[in-house]
Amino acid sequence: MAASELYTKFARVWIPDPEEVWKSAELLKDYKPGDKVLLLHLEEGKDLEYHLDPKTKELPHLRNPDILVGENDLTALSYLHEPAVLHNLRVRFIDSKLIYTYCGIVLVAINPYEQLPIYGEDIINAYSGQNMGDMDPHIFAVAEEAYKQMARDERNQSIIVSGESGAGKTVSAKYAMRYFATVSGSASEANVEEKVLASNPIMESIGNAKTTRNDNSSRFGKYIEIGFDKRYRIIGANMRTYLLEKSRVVFQAEEERNYHIFYQLCASAKLPEFKMLRLGNADNFNYTKQGGSPVIEGVDDAKEMAHTRQACTLLGISESHQMGIFRILAGILHLGNVGFTSRDADSCTIPPKHEPLCIFCELMGVDYEEMCHWLCHRKLATATETYIKPISKLQATNARDALAKHIYAKLFNWIVDNVNQALHSAVKQHSFIGVLDIYGFETFEINSFEQFCINYANEKLQQQFNMHVFKLEQEEYMKEQIPWTLIDFYDNQPCINLIESKLGILDLLDEECKMPKGTDDTWAQKLYNTHLNKCALFEKPRLSNKAFIIQHFADKVEYQCEGFLEKNKDTVFEEQIKVLKSSKFKMLPELFQDDEKAISPTSATSSGRTPLTRTPAKPTKGRPGQMAKEHKKTVGHQFRNSLHLLMETLNATTPHYVRCIKPNDFKFPFTFDEKRAVQQLRACGVLETIRISAAGFPSRWTYQEFFSRYRVLMKQKDVLSDRKQTCKNVLEKLILDKDKYQFGKTKIFFRAGQVAYLEKLRADKLRAACIRIQKTIRGWLLRKKYLRMRKAAITMQRYVRGYQARCYAKFLRRTKAATIIQKYWRMYVVRRRYKIRRAATIVLQSYLRGFLARNRYRKILREHKAVIIQKRVRGWLARTHYKRSMHAIIYLQCCFRRMMAKRELKKLKIEARSVERYKKLHIGMENKIMQLQRKVDEQNKDYKCLVEKLTNLEGIYNSETEKLRSDLERLQLSEEEAKVATGRVLSLQEEIAKLRKDLEQTRSEKKCIEEHADRYKQETEQLVSNLKEENTLLKQEKEALNHRIVQQAKEMTETMEKKLVEETKQLELDLNDERLRYQNLLNEFSRLEERYDDLKEEMTLMVHVPKPGHKRTDSTHSSNESEYIFSSEIAEMEDIPSRTEEPSEKKVPLDMSLFLKLQKRVTELEQEKQVMQDELDRKEEQVLRSKAKEEERPQIRGAELEYESLKRQELESENKKLKNELNELRKALSEKSAPEVTAPGAPAYRVLMEQLTSVSEELDVRKEEVLILRSQLVSQKEAIQPKDDKNTMTDSTILLEDVQKMKDKGEIAQAYIGLKETNRSSALDYHELNEDGELWLVYEGLKQANRLLESQLQSQKRSHENEAEALRGEIQSLKEENNRQQQLLAQNLQLPPEARIEASLQHEITRLTNENLDLMEQLEKQDKTVRKLKKQLKVFAKKIGELEVGQMENISPGQIIDEPIRPVNIPRKEKDFQGMLEYKKEDEQKLVKNLILELKPRGVAVNLIPGLPAYILFMCVRHADYLNDDQKVRSLLTSTINSIKKVLKKRGDDFETVSFWLSNTCRFLHCLKQYSGEEGFMKHNTSRQNEHCLTNFDLAEYRQVLSDLAIQIYQQLVRVLENILQPMIVSGMLEHETIQGVSGVKPTGLRKRTSSIADEGTYTLDSILRQLNSFHSVMCQHGMDPELIKQVVKQMFYIIGAITLNNLLLRKDMCSWSKGMQIRYNVSQLEEWLRDKNLMNSGAKETLEPLIQAAQLLQVKKKTDDDAEAICSMCNALTTAQIVKVLNLYTPVNEFEERVSVSFIRTIQMRLRDRKDSPQLLMDAKHIFPVTFPFNPSSLALETIQIPASLGLGFISRV
């Protein structure tokens, strides 16, 4: 489109600025073609005329719309150019505090110079498994993308981290490796992950140093390959290093340090093991004191040394090798102190017994004389002879330094090799991810060989980067099938050819190094001759013949030739190396094993007059000329080869790029220097990426996104059903130039600037629509208002005018009369007013004059005092000003003298350089020194600033520490007060009980007290009549006091209630914490078990040929055998096989440190588990004891009577029900039988009816007989053992209870018939006392009645004794109260009248308070009674239901109809089952296999009763308990537990399986409790169920084991739930638009476009709800406890809320008003689901509260202070960090909405600064709430359970 359409009035542009690089401005008028000047308005308020370049006529860059500013991806910007990139980075870095930004495939990381809480485990978990484009930019996102692509594409990956020194490369690489270590394995064990991370401290100590730009600068490049196995777990690593800066060993610039390891050694010199090294302060050594900055602020070198040694130990470097390393490093320091003395110009010597050299030789184990000789001489070899030549002092010093550098380089390589060996794994590497931490493009004022190599490496990397970006762009275009046009991008291959091709710079440098007399000057001339004017990228400086310029991809760089040859040759004298090789110190020769080939014999360099010593040359073996050919490889050649290998590796991998940016040179946190940032953006290739993107189609929209966003630009007739065609039609009308866009298969591609143009059209359309709507509505409203006002005005005018006329006439009449009256009245009023005012004025004047006089006095006094103060202050100010002026003058004098000294120094330097040889040697040193001096000054300033900041931070830290310490003490005091309060509550309860006892005594003596009161009243009546007025006042005071007492009592009650609630909550929290800790330990234990299994499998795989006869049981069996055995003898017997297996295990290659650590950890866990188990048992006993005490409290007599009557009514109703059921059976038989059988005249019918009638008659007769016999027995017992009638129950109640007892055992009719049949079958049975056994039946009934009566009498006796004791206590308390009252009366009679009245009032107050407390106690007692009665009613209702079910089961119509042909008999119970299952011991494995291992949960859950496997297992345990078979019980339980573990390990990812076994494990646990025989668990049992209790074994220990197993299964269930729900949550809760059309769509960047995972079908909220329904139905189907289902649902909702909120906090595109509305709607749907399932009280809704508040935060207004206050009060479930993060990320979808201002966010932070919450940003999505398993007894009778044939358990039988 034309420029005139874009450059219109109010359009915003960027113009160049020398200070800010780019400055924003706004057009004041439209641009027209041909204009030479643009009228601009700057943001600071100035107007500017911007002149266009007359040659290029280029217009300034357009600025992106505000809606695009702050995007995650720079390629999402519509206008892609340098100012847009710079502004976007600045907004994100400064305003939003976001340090990461995508630029296409590049992650741009800006160093914040501040610790940020964005690298924790929670952030790693949040990014794990996510697509890169879905989350906010982060180094973890790049690492996750690499990890995911490695697993998906089976291709190795690389992460290339580059940037300037101090930009954060090393930290970024470190966090990437930490991410891999966390997601690919457990980082808490001493395995490869820890070793990979442990290599960092070692490499930092030997390869990092302090520079002027960075305190921890890496002085080498490294490429770390992290190896993974087939399961993508870290198995090892390998490190390659590049271009170590060896010169730093011997030389450091000002304010810089040598490598950290030297200073760490010096700081640790006082350690005993380091005494032999003879080290001291770092200032004592030449190699560590040159920089003058031996200490780094905030770094403790001694502690760092300890970390380094610890890392070496972890990596397997032995103590002897560590000491060897330290010996060599100490030797290097002592070597640097070796001094030389000149004998003449060409020779030197070392003083005899020179101490530094002696120490060096002693540490290195070499001969002193030999080393002394070769440090001052060198050997020159020719073809025939060898010469030994002395060297000058300068040459000797250089040789010494070269030797030190060589030793350090060899030691560095040796350490790297050992680290690689430690990281190497025997397991075959399947794939790897490489992390390249390499120096970025460098340019300084003086650039040398190091900068040349660094920039050469960056040229190669930039070429590879350009090709990769180009390839990705091409793939995207081809994938979308759009016309492919070649993008023109910078190709730096010519620059690379200039450096590395034949006769290139490196080639000429190597050739010059081979020349005998080669120098830097000759090499420079060769460069000029070869490349000058032939290569456009090579230039020569105008004023120098010893430098050259290369045009790199980032900038032109001028290199000084001086030192190139020396650094490239890296010459070390061979004789010195031979001396070191002959060392007695074994480690030293290892460093030089490869030097025979590497070091060449030195050749003669000059033919001076130096005296030579001739020796015959030794003949060389092999071919002639071999020695001449075996030249040492130069540094440049080695670097080129290693760089080629690196590029081959990178080209074979998929690269990922991280570009680190240094925002400022002063290390100020969150300070952005635009100039420095632009330099680095140009150097690191970010702008090149932008240029490549801008050359193509950077903006890309799907058709649906485009339609949703720009629907407002379409007319109704343009909208078709085909979205693609609709978009095409609209675009052709909106953008006429078809080259500006392309239509792909799924996306529309736009050129740069087109999206901004479309946004402008959209905004204009919306703005015009808004204006039109506003215009119409305002016009209509105003016209309507005008017509209404006009009508009202006319009406009002009519009435007002008439009224005014009438009033005017009346006015005229009254005016005359009023005038006369007024005349006289005014005179009177004026006269009166005058008198009053005169009198008042006189009074006022008197007071005012006195007041003014006093004020004047005080003013004079104040002025006098002020003059004295001013005198003192002015004197002090004058003295202060004088001192400051003197200080400034002295400072100026110092500066001037320093300047003069510098000038003098400069003159001296000029004079010193007059000597020609000195000039050659030290050319260029002056400039360098001046430059370094300036840098030193700047560094000093920075250092002072940092010191001040550090002091402030230390002060803040100390204050915070004190504050936290005071808080801790306060909490401890509150805890002690809570304990004291608990004790007080107990004592108060005892006092209350005592007062209750005293109450009755007080009542009995009440009459006596009343008599005393009457007498007292008579005596006081006369006194009261005399003091009536005073009495009235006292009554008022009394009422006030009463009111106050009531109020205080109320407040006290409320306070106590609040305290009780708080203490209860605190106890619950403590219990939950303890439970969570215990369950976490269980989880850790199970994880260690799994780890042990994995290690065992690996060991098994590593053993190729197993020995015969060696067999290993499963780990789960062995672990449980050793842990859960309750029989010590059997445990000892079964431990024997495991002991015999130990020697075979030792032969397997295993990391013993890992094994011992695991063993120790397991032991600790077992001990902690035992302690926690004891605590849990103790707490449970306390709870049971308290419950028992509550139940044993004597009930009120009335409640007991009601209870007995209720039981009697229940039994009567049950009897009626039995009769009704019998009648119903008759009716059903008559209705449902076949016509021929059930007809009234049918024979079968008659027989059946006759039998039923006879049975019912017999039953009635037997009942009467039983009643008579029992009554006789009771009377006999009364005669023998007489009891008090009050303690016995009525006979009718006893008999009814006996009937009930018999009903509990079985139906009376069936019992009778069963006995009758038994008597018929065995005539000789001793039970047969008469014909049909009636007497035996009666005898059994009487025995049971006798037992029942005895138990009831004992209980009545106990209750009677308790009641008598209580009455005695009350009598005693009443007596005491009576005595106290008498004493009070006696005292009151002796008091004067006033005191007597006061005492009586006090007494009355005390009496009322006591009565109030008594009433409250009675109320509480009645409430408890009501609650207990309600509970009993529920129990009886449940029993009635069970009896009804039992009756229906025992007498069913089906039993009668089964055999219609033969005569119908009454169904009889052939056998009375005892609820046990019998099996043989050899069938145990078959039982476990069929019931657990091979059981399919789905078939069991659908067709059989819930929990059937648990019931079967328990019935088997009951039978083993019945047999008293210890071993069988133990074996069955252990096999059951191990089999469940095995099933869950095999099918642990299947929700149905885990849910099924969780339900059955809990049911099994409940059965063990229900039938344990313990009173606390037997309350809800029937008498029949109580008969099924275990008799021989106490399985409490196994209950704990099963509880632990249930906890582990629950945690596994939660993990399965999380794995299933996690892919759905983000898509369903955040991304899917549940409310269509609410949220707009914004343009996306390259990351969002090129996700590593293709869309697999989006999930919606309905998907989540369907999945929740599925989970709920499965759990209900499996019969899971309702309380457990609630806990599972609560955990599910917590996972949904946590993951949704975490993604919201990490995704800027989700933080908008419309998205808040979507989230709130989705949450309401989840709440509706909870209501439908009756789970609102499960606590699940509360877990969504943080998400709800985050959604509300997105929707509320965010401008004023009131809004800030509302936000702070509303968001109490969010932490301060989360609130601030949401506000920072808030992004308007439309440009009409304003962003959240920085001032508003600061206001929020100020208001929340006192809030004490977690600083953690993300919620812990892995958190699992502690689970509890409330006891849930089963009403199912064990004897009724049938074993289905489908289970294949025919080998077990019911007993």
Curated annotation (Swiss-Prot):
Chain residue ranges for the region called Actin-binding: 643-665
SMART domains tied to this protein: DIL, IQ, MYSc
Domain Myosin motor, first and last residues per copy: 69-763
GO molecular function per UniProt: actin filament binding; ATP binding; ATP hydrolysis activity; calmodulin binding; microfilament motor activity; RNA binding; small GTPase binding
Binding residues for ATP: 163-170
Catalyzed chemical reaction(s): ATP + H2O = ADP + phosphate + H(+)
Modified residues (N-acetylalanine): 2
Stretches for region Disordered: 598-631
Gene Ontology biological process terms in this record: actin filament organization; actin filament-based movement; cellular response to insulin stimulus; melanosome transport; post-Golgi vesicle-mediated transport; protein localization to plasma membrane; protein transport; vesicle transport along actin filament
InterPro entries: Dilute_dom (IPR002710), IQ_motif_EF-hand-BS (IPR000048), Kinesin_motor_dom_sf (IPR036961), Myo5a_CBD (IPR037988), Myosin_head_motor_dom-like (IPR001609), Myosin_N (IPR004009), MYSc_Myo5 (IPR036103), P-loop_NTPase (IPR027417)
Pfam families membership: DIL (PF01843), IQ (PF00612), Myosin_head (PF00063)
Chain intervals with Polar residues compositional bias: 600-613
IQ domain mapped to chain residues: 766-788, 789-818, 814-836, 837-861, 862-883, 885-914
Tissue specificity note: Detected in melanocytes.
Family membership noted in the UniProt record: Belongs to the TRAFAC class myosin-kinesin ATPase superfamily. Myosin family.
Physiological role: Processive actin-based motor that can move in large steps approximating the 36-nm pseudo-repeat of the actin filament. Can hydrolyze ATP in the presence of actin, which is essential for its function as a motor protein. Involved in melanosome transport. Also mediates the transport of vesicles to the plasma membrane. May also be required for some polarization process involved in dendrite formation.
Complex formation: May be a homodimer, which associates with multiple calmodulin or myosin light chains. Interacts with RIPL2, the interaction is required for its role in dendrite formation. Interacts with MLPH. Interacts with SYTL4. Interacts with MYRIP. Interacts with RAB10; mediates the transport to the plasma membrane of SLC2A4/GLUT4 storage vesicles. Interacts with FMR1; this interaction occurs in association with polyribosome.
Protein name (Swiss-Prot/TrEMBL): Unconventional myosin-Va
Lineage per the UniProt record: Eukaryota, Metazoa, Chordata, Craniata, Vertebrata
